[in-house]
C-alpha cells in the first residue's frame, strides 16, 4: 500500500488525486479551461467533474454546438472528463453537453474564469494571469485589524450609481468614482455584495452559478483586479461577499450537474432550501470541498481581496434551518447541527489562514452558535470576525419605538454588553435592513423630518462608540429615505437639500473621529475598553459610558434618546477639564445648537457615583463625545 501511495503522489495526476481527496485547494489551476501550447500550436485543455454522466462533450461556436464533435475522455473513475481543443481564442464561448440516461443538458463550466453577461449563460475562455499589480506596499503592510479601525461601506455595484441610460458603471469607472467617494467619507474598508456570476439580478448576487467568474456585467476579471489595485493604492481594503451555502436551480448551473445530485446533497432532508428555492452544497463530498475552498483561495489570490464575508452561515450550521418538523433529521448525535458543514467551515478557515494569515474571514451568523471567531484548535469555527445580528436587531427595534415608550425597551440598548466580548464582532447596518418594507435607516426613526435627522445622528454616535467594528450600507451616510432598490441607483440628488448634506458632513466627522481615536477601536474584547457611567437612566432614555485605549486614554459618551430636553444635566466624571469633540446637536449638522461651550471643568458636585461632574444642556435626541484634556 505504501508503494502504491508513493506512486500516486509522484504521478503527474497529483492535482486530480488531491481533487478527489478534497485537498486540492488550487483546483482551478487544473479543472476548467486552460490555454497551453502543444506541438507548437495553441491548445485549450478542458476538464470537468461529472461523475454520473454517461458522456460529456465540449460545445461552442467552434464546433457548431454539436455534442458529437468534441467528446471528452473520462480520466478518473470518480468522473473527471478531459478534452483538448486547438485553434480557440480568448473570449470564445463554450459549454459542456452533459448526457445522463439519454438526456443532454448544456452546462456552464463550474471553473470558468469568465462568463457571458446575463441573460447569456455560456462560459468564456479567459487568461486569468498577466495583470501587473501596483499594490505591493499595501500588501506588505497589511495586518489583521483586531486593534485597528474597521469602518466598512457596504455596496451593491449594480445600484450605487447608474448611467443616465440605465447601464452599469464598469469596474474601472467605479475605481474612479466609488473609491474616491468612499475615501472622502473616511471609511477604511469597502464590502462588495456578491459578484461571482449570477443569472438573476433580483437575487442581489446571492444565487451564483460561477464561483470563479466575476460578473461580466461590470467588465472583465482584469478590470476588477484594477478596481482592487486602485483601492489598495488609496489605502482601502476590499471584502467580497461569498456564498458557499447554497446555489440556484438554473439549468445551466451547478444544479444536478451530471443529471443527478452532484454538487448538492442527495438526501431529501438536506438538499434544498425550499424557502429560497435553492440547492444546498454537499459539504461532506470531497470534490465539493476542493471546489469551494479553491473558489475562496482563487478570489483572495488572483484578485488580492482582503477578505470574504461568508453568507448565510446559520443555514449551514443547522439541519432544521428553515425547515418544519418532519422536514429534517437529526445528526448521529441526535442534534440539529450539520456536522459536515461545521467540519467544512473549520477546514475552510484553516486553509485560508495558512496561506493568508491576515485575511478577514467574516461570518454572517445570526444565532448564538458559540465560538464562531475562536481558532479551530480551541474548538471554534475559525473565523476572525462575525456580524453582531443580536445587537442590530435590538437597537433597530429600540430606535423604531416611539420615544415616549422607549423606557420600557431600555434593555435593548444595554443587553448587547452582556455578550459584546464573546466574539470579534462587526456591528452591521446592512442592505438587509433597508428593503422589503423595513424602511430606510432614517425612515425607521419616529417623528417629523427634523426629529428623524436628530435621531439618526444620535444613533450613529451610539453605534460608533459601541464595542465592535462598523458596517453601514450605501445610502445610510446621507439619509436616503427611499428603501434600497437594486434596479435603481442611489438618490444622490438628495444632497442638494441642506439636511441631507449636513448629515453627510456629520457622518464624515464621525468617521474621522472613529478612525483617529484609538479608544474607540483598540480594545474590543474585554471590559478594559468599556465602562458604564450610567446604564440605567431608563426613565430619561439616557445612557453614558466611556471607551479606553491601551494607553489609558478615554472618550466619554452620553446619548439622550428621549424627546425631552434636559437643562443643566450633570455627568459624573473624574476631576479635570473635558473638551467636547462631537456634538450631534450642532447647527452645522442640522441641530438646534442648544449645547453651549466646548470646554467643561468639573466641579465638586457628585453624579453617577463620582464626586465630581460637569454640567451642560442635553437636548432631545443628542449625542456628545468628550475627551479629557487636563487633570
Predicted regions and their residues:
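The feature marks proteins involved in alpha-glucan
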Residues: 1-45, 75-154, 159-166, 173, ...
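Conserved, mostly hydrophobic/aromatic
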Residues: 48, 96, 155, 182, ...
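Short proline/glycine-enriched turn/loop motifs at strand-loop junctions of beta-rich domains
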Residues: 49-56, 573-576
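C-terminal beta-strand-rich structural cap/linker in extracellular carbohydrate-active enzymes
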Residues: 90-94, 597-631
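Substrate-binding/active-site clefts of carbohydrate-active enzymes
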Residues: 116, 137-149, 156-337, 600
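Conserved alpha/beta catalytic core and glycan-binding cleft of carbohydrate-active enzymes
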Residues: 118-119, 304-306, 324-489, 494, ...
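C-terminal accessory region downstream of the catalytic core in glycan-modifying enzymes
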Residues: 503-504, 510-512, 570-601
Amino acid at each position: 500500500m505504501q508503494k502504491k501511495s508513493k506512486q500516486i503522489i509522484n504521478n503527474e495526476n497529483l492535482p486530480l488525486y488531491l481533487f478527489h481527496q478534497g485537498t486540492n485547494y488550487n483546483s482551478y489551476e487544473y479543472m476548467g479551461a486552460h490555454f497551453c501550447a502543444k506541438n507548437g500550436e495553441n491548445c485549450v485543455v478542458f476538464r470537468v467533474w461529472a461523475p454520473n454522466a454517461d458522456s460529456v462533450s465540449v460545445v461552442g461556436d467552434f464546433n457548431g454546438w454539436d455534442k458529437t464533435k468534441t467528446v471528452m475522455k473520462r480520466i478518473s473513475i470518480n468522473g473527471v472528463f478531459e478534452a483538448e481543443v486547438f485553434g480557440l481564442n480568448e473570449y470564445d464561448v463554450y459549454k459542456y453537453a452533459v448526457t445522463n440516461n439519454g438526456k443532454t443538458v448544456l452546462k456552464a463550466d463550474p471553473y470558468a474564469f469568465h462568463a457571458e453577461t446575463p441573460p447569456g449563460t455560456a462560459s468564456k475562455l479567459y487568461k486569468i494571469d498577466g495583470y501587473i499589480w501596483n499594490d505591493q506596499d499595501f500588501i506588505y503592510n497589511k495586518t489583521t485589524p483586531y486593534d485597528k479601525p474597521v469602518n466598512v461601506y457596504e455596496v451593491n455595484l449594480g445600484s450605487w450609481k447608474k448611467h443616465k441610460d440605465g447601464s452599469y458603471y464598469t469596474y474601472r469607472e467605479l475605481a474612479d468614482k466609488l473609491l474616491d467617494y468612499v475615501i472622502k467619507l473616511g471609511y477604511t474598508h469597502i464590502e462588495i455584495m456578491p459578484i461571482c456570476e449570477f443569472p438573476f439580478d433580483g437575487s442581489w448576487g446571492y444565487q451564483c452559478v460561477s464561483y470563479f467568474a466575476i460578473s461580466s456585467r461590470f467588465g472583465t476579471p482584469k478590470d476588477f483586479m484594477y478596481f482592487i489595485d486602485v483601492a489598495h493604492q488609496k489605502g482601502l481594503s476590499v471584502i467580497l461577499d461569498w456564498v458557499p451555502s447554497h446555489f440556484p436551480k438554473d439549468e445551466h448551473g451547478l444544479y444536478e450537474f451530471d443529471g443527478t445530485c452532484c454538487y448538492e446533497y442527495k438526501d431529501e432532508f438536506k438538499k434544498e432550501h425550499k424557502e429560497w428555492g435553492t440547492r444546498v452544497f454537499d459539504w461532506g463530498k470531497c470534490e465539493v470541498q476542493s471546489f469551494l475552498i479553491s473558489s475562496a483561495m482563487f478570489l483572495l489570490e488572483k484578485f488580492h481581496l482582503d477578505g470574504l464575508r461568508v453568507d448565510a452561515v446559520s443555514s449551514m450550521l443547522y439541519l432544521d434551518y428553515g425547515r418544519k418538523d418532519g422536514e429534517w433529521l437529526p445528526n448521529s448525535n441526535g442534534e440539529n447541527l450539520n456536522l459536515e458543514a461545521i467540519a467544512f467551515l473549520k477546514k475552510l478557515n484553516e486553509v485560508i489562514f495558512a496561506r493568508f494569515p491576515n485575511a478577514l474571514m467574516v461570518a454572517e451568523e445570526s444565532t448564538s452558535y458559540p465560538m464562531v471567531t475562536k481558532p479551530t484548535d480551541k474548538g471554534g469555527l475559525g473565523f476572525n470576525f462575525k456580524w453582531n445580528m443580536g445587537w442590530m436587531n435590538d437597537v433597530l427595534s429600540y430606535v423604531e419605538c416611539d420615544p415616549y415608550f422607549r423606557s420600557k425597551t431600555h434593555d435593548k440598548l444595554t443587553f448587547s454588553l452582556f455578550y459584546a466580548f464573546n466574539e470579534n464582532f462587526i456591528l452591521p447596518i446592512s442592505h438587509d435592513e433597508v428593503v422589503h418594507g423595513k424602511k430606510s435607516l432614517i425612515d425607521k426613526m419616529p417623528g417629523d423630518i427634523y426629529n428623524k435627522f436628530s435621531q439618526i445622528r444620535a444613533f450613529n454616535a451610539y453605534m460608533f462608540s459601541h464595542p465592535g467594528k462598523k458596517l453601514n450600507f450605501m445610502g445610510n451616510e446621507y439619509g436616503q429615505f427611499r428603501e434600497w432598490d437594486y434596479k435603481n441607483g442611489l438618490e444622490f440628488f438628495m444632497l442638494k437639500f441642506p439636511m441631507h448634506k449636513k448629515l453627510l458632513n456629520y457622518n464624515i466627522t464621525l468617521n474621522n473621529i472613529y478612525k483617529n481615536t484609538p479608544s474607540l477601536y483598540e480594545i474590543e474584547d474585554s471590559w478594559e475598553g468599556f465602562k458604564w457611567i450610567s446604564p440605567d437612566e431608563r426613565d430619561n432614555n439616557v445612557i453614558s459610558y466611556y471607551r479606553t485605549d491601551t494607553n489609558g486614554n478615554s472618550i466619554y459618551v452620553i446619548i439622550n434618546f428621549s424627546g425631552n430636553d434636559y437643562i443643566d444635566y450633570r455627568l459624573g466624571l473624574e476631576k479635570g477639564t473635558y473638551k467636547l469633540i462631537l456634538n450631534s446637536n450642532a447647527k452645522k449638522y442640522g441641530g438646534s445648537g442648544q449645547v453651549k461651550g466646548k470646554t467643561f471643568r468639573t466641579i465638586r458636585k457628585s453624579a453617577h457615583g463620582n464626586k465630581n461632574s460637569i454640567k451642560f444642556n442635553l437636548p432631545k435626541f443628542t449625542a456628545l463625545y468628550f475627551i479629557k484634556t487636563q487633570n
